[in-house]
From Swiss-Prot:
Keywords: Hydrolase. This is N(4)-acetylcytidine amidohydrolase. The active site is at K20, T23, E73. Residues 6-98 form the ASCH domain.
């Protein structure tokens, strides 16, 4: 059985349309492996909405995020940093999980 990853409801449409192709997580969600298929569910209610294939998992700091990361998240760099700070207040070390729908 595939492991699961959750996303806030506000990201569902972008994931389904392949506009969001990465997720940035803290160390507690950094153990996914390239080639692994994950069930994707909404964080708020646990409803399944697709599967994704993990392409890569790369460590990164908040300050090292670029416009390319923001583009892969389908938002501006300022928006991306704000979202990350809201979800993970006080953290600086993260992991970029690149994925594709499958």
């Amino acid at each position: 059985m595939n492991r699961e990853i959750t996303f806030f409801r506000r990201f569902e449409a972008d994931i389904l349309a392949s506009r969001k192709t990465i997720t940035i997580r803290d160390s507690s969600e950094s153990d996914f492996r390239p080639g692994e298929i994950l069930r994707v569910c909404r964080n708020e209610d646990g409803v399944f909405f697709c599967n994704i294939l993990v392409k890569s998992v790369t460590p990164i700091t908040l300050d090292a995020l670029t416009e390319r990361h923001a583009e892969q998240e389908n938002m501006s760099l300022d928006e991306l940093k704000k979202v990350i700070k809201d979800i993970y207040p006080g953290l600086e070390q993260f992991y970029v999980i690149e994925f594709t729908r499958c």
